[in-house]
Amino acid sequence: MANGKVIQVIGSVVDVEFSADSMPALFNALEIPRDNGKMVLEVQSHVGNNRVKCLSFTPTDGLERGAEVIDTKRPLSVPVGRNTLGRIFNVLGEPLDNRGDVKAEKTMPIHRSAPAMDELESSAQVLETGLKVIDLIAPFARGGKIGALGGAGVGKTVLIQELIRNIATEHEGFSVFAGVGERSREGNDLWHEMEDSGVLPKTTMVFGQMNELPAVRLRIALTGLTMAEYFRDEERQDVLLFIDNIYRYTLAGMEVSALLGRMPSAVGYQPTLATEMGALQERIASTKQGSITSFQAVYVPADDYTDPGVVATFGHLDAMIALERSLAEQALYPAVDPLASNSRILDPQVVGEEHYQVARDVQKVLQRYKDLQDVIAILGMEELSEEDKLTVARARRIQRFLTQPMFVSEVFTGRPGQYVSLAETIRGFKEILEGKHDSLPEQAFYMVGTIDDAVAEAKKLSAA
């Protein structure tokens, strides 16, 4: 028989039997015709006796043994090209926005090889984000991979939404957003925000959210990546790829691994963790044709940075933004820890001597303040030397100046968002380090844009 039939159904795992001469290849998409459309499966393993074990992308409710299964003879393929811009898709490439079918130029399989070594090209060009703490401490490389790491509720999604607003608005190319195992409400909010800001016509969005089956959450990142690869390779564009959240991709892999009966490894993760992460991350690359700059939110379970699921991501990142709960508790937003965040291109040969020196001096002052906090807690400020008192005062001003009102949180805070250029960021911190603003109150530096805004705020406070 050319087609197969369902032998066993356990949750979202379906066993299908084929004849010996028509066995489907691994990762082939299989279809089961249903009254209300079709059910799509993906072949995961050959288990012997002409049987294959598959994972379903759609709920298996009502599926019975003996149902006919059709081999599409190719991996799951999704629409790509300019007609996907401004639209929202699911893992199968079907539109979710009730705006009719997509007339795509072509479709591409979601399983592809990474670019060959001789096609790769790395850039050392800084991509300005308009966020002071990131541009100063962990500058982004155009065509690089950037990770925003943090536990639950410290602001990863808000930060990634702000980056979409700042960079996609300023950026000329196309953007792809992949929602991987996150909240549907946030995806809905993001869609409306992007529509209001005028960014949506240059953006393709794909969603496989928390309520979806594990196979969907595992493959949705590949669907988004395939669409981004088309813009890079065929359109020769510089593409922005946003993934929220890459940890949910790992978690979906863990669920799939358990469903397929594989032996778990450390902390219950799948034994193929590094391979799966590498297969995804190596495809997010910049070639001679174009670049993919990726921003990935990384959930850190229980704030444990040694968790294998988090560690698997580290080695692939060019810049790492660590979001710290203690800063969020003090309402210092964005809650980026300037001492734990880093970037491959924070190098005087790339960013220039002045930027490098100011960034390192800021970190030095903040580190000294951190070292002195135990002394201050036990003995009080009076016991510090004059030099240390000055360091603490400047560190507290720097801490507050690292905060910034965001465009995407205007509705919550009532403060208009601020985009600060890199030159203004460097000037502001340099003046604080030089002591030009030692006379201004600390509060004047909180939630302002440029250093001139801080001076204006200080005048307002003194007049009050």
From Swiss-Prot:
Main subcellular localisation: membrane
Catalysis performed (reactions): ATP + H2O + 4 H(+)(in) = ADP + phosphate + 5 H(+)(out)
Keyword Membrane: yes
Keywords, comma-separated and alphabetical: ATP synthesis, ATP-binding, Cell membrane, CF(1), Hydrogen ion transport, Ion transport, Membrane, Nucleotide-binding, Translocase, Transport
A single cellular component GO annotation: plasma membrane
Topology in the lipid bilayer: Peripheral membrane protein
InterPro entries, per database record: AAA+_ATPase (IPR003593), ATP-synt_VA_C (IPR055190), ATP_synth_F1_bsu (IPR005722), ATPase_a/bsu_AS (IPR020003), ATPase_alpha/beta_chains (IPR050053), ATPase_F1/V1/A1_a/bsu_N (IPR004100), ATPase_F1/V1/A1_a/bsu_N_sf (IPR036121), ATPase_F1/V1/A1_a/bsu_nucl-bd (IPR000194)
Protein function: Produces ATP from ADP in the presence of a proton gradient across the membrane. The catalytic sites are hosted primarily by the beta subunits.
Subunit structure, as described in the record: F-type ATPases have 2 components, CF(1) - the catalytic core - and CF(0) - the membrane proton channel. CF(1) has five subunits: alpha(3), beta(3), gamma(1), delta(1), epsilon(1). CF(0) has three main subunits: a(1), b(2) and c(9-12). The alpha and beta chains form an alternating ring which encloses part of the gamma chain. CF(1) is attached to CF(0) by a central stalk formed by the gamma and epsilon chains, while a peripheral stalk is formed by the delta and b chains.
Protein name: ATP synthase subunit beta
Organism: Dehalococcoides mccartyi (strain ATCC BAA-2266 / KCTC 15142 / 195) (Dehalococcoides ethenogenes (strain 195))
Gene encoding the protein: atpD
